[in-house]
Amino acid sequence: MEEPPVTLASFTLDDLLAARIENHIERVSEIAAQASGEADILKNIEEIRVAWETTNFTIKNYRDTKDRFYITEIEDLTTLLEDHQMRVQGCMGSRHVARIRADVEAWERKLGTVSDVIDEWLVFQKSWMYLENIFNAEDIIK
């Protein structure tokens, strides 16, 4: 009669001893190191995810208008973005990333997109503010 498969819930120290785990210490150590490395990477990615879930742009009314806004206090956001991009690059360089590479690459793309959007937004905002001043000048309005 065949024994039922061992499940995590029923796995015991006796099962390890019966498998002669002491003969496989090197392999067990490799697996443990890989799992620990993956856990560190996943922890980093989770911290980044949580940070971006709660991060907001700071916007203010442009001059005394009620319907025109601009982004302000961008330095903290840029610092956070650069820090997270470096952390993701560090994760990508880890030897433990192989099995979770797709998740890390996804965050690399997301952060790259955020960076591109912020850069374009700031270029547009600077141009808009410049043109706003020109077209609202007294001699142009008349």
What is the predicted role of each segment?
Residues 1-142:
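Extended amphipathic alpha-helical elements
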